[in-house]
């Protein structure tokens, strides 16, 4: 796997063309990826020698089950229906399912890095059972940085309230009188629920737009040309990216009530 | 079971239910004949409120207006879940969800009710209460009740006729006592008679009734 | 002359177009539901003990097999993938209960062929075809308005048989069919080798070998739970759909009256959305139980854990790994030869 092969005028390695003649300049992608991986390194930092220190067992279970739902949706159900409307996101149902399930995982786990982990597990699984590892590891970087990054960033602020029309307000430190003081610290802070409908709408819009823009903006703008060596016109890139913002907003708002209902039922 | 409920079609032959060919029935007519309560209530709850769940069944059975209102009120009073009407069925406890799933089927007033392991996941007291309730409804409405169960005590207590399904065919049929008598076949079928039956047999009255004795205080 | 008038008569053109659009997917649905059924789908993921070489191999060797086959398939021309696919299918002979497995795996692979080749033959982006083949031939042209569906549209003037020169035609291309077959061969080689691993290895052994290869146990656990939950999700989907059918839902609108027909169709869409939410709830409801079960068995309690049954590389494994490395090197060499590289993948 680790060898370079000269192919035409490009260097091709594991199916990657390393074409840097892209619409989004490579350094933007580099900075964005480095920033996001730093966030993941922080979110998945070990605690007491265990990686993913913040995550509880049930978080992994939620992520695994949602990855299984994604696999079933994308590889067993989607192929049964003709893919109509690939140009815009509005009627492209594979993306609708992905939006719903990735946002659901982020909502149920509610920790930064949860969207990234879901997308990572899903990509790994789909490589194993369907696509093959050609073009890796760049597809991993593409999927993680474009589908999950903004949701994970937003989760730093929203945390467990993501996709709930509430926000937590610290009432101040609940007196930690116990002299032993073993498990005090931040969990002992009393939080009060404040209604925040506007934040709920921002949650929905942000999630929908992030996932809707992944393909037209990030893939057409950089990863597709970079890995496959093909090219797109800047006008197509710009028009589909802008169109996908609208589609993403609509999709986010449509799936939001369902995610809210499921989160309420399960927690 | 699925064949009977019209979910699958038989590969050949046909099924006659009250002189209707089940394969030719439309969905609307089928719900009025047969109700099927699934093992896990989560498998059959779809709406965001209990009322919506009952209305969903009635809509499919083409019952509208006052009639629908009346039926909903009757069934929830009957099952004692009238205070749950505006709640989400998914948020209820296991026992309550079970009652809602039974209500969602009974509201269409089917003539045959199929129950797939109706007391799975319920404690002893709860399952006795539920079975008594279902039996009362059965007697009052004159329904036929078909129940799938591994619980031999329930077979002994509640059924008029028992069928032993083994290896895809009906291995034996008869009244429950006759099934329990066939003791040499039990290891093969994987069943063991309830203790009540063993006791009555050991005191020398093998076919003594083991039916649940119900006292009507009225 | 006559043929062109028949083929491109507006009404006939629309009929042929719609048949081409829907024939492939309908055939796929038929294959999956009539020949396999959901039950068969689920048996794909059930492990049955066996005694042949393939069961005695180290799981890591089989994981490596899957990775190397998919990698080589991804970087080389389609007929190399086809050869590897045949070779992997030959290994299926070593599985126990082979008939049952082929009864499920073959229609699945066939469905994958028809589905992908059919879709790509009309939906492959023109820019891809131009890059790969440098020349695109349109076999049949659809009404121009269908370009909005994302059907292949050429830019420029093309000669179309029986019609003459057309500018910016929309339709079925010969290169699209070839392209579809190429990426299908790649996909089926990957699917077949992945299924071989799942068929011949108990899930706990896969987890152990992932952990031994240095993957954090959290990732291995999540990955394996996801794989083993796939049949559960399929089963849940089937049961939920059946319970809707038992309550009298007809998934095909029946009415002849157009207004009623639309109302019925909207109702069906609403029911399907309700069913999807139910499937998600039914699946995720188990999460707490699974988490408790994992915690009780001391998941994540110790960094290094030992196992009662250790897995070790044997002689067969070393031979197999040597062969796989030869395959990989050969694959990389071949992919560099002119005209032997792979075509890009269109998701």
Where are these regions (language model features)?
Chain C
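Helix-loop junctions at the membrane-solvent interface of multi-pass transporters
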Residues: 75-76, 94-95, 122-126, 337
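Short, aromatic-rich membrane-interface segments at the entry and exit
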Residues: 77-85, 101-106
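Hydrophobic, aromatic-rich alpha-helical transmembrane segments
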Residues: 11, 15, 56-60, 98-105, ...
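Structural signal for the C-terminal ends of transmembrane alpha-helices
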Residues: 91-99, 200-201
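Juxtamembrane/interface alpha-helical elements of multi-pass membrane proteins
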Residues: 105-262
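Hydrophobic transmembrane alpha-helices of multi-pass, membrane-embedded glycosylation machinery
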Residues: 85-93, 109-110
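Transmembrane alpha-helix interface motif
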Residues: 1-57, 61, 65-78, 86-90, ...
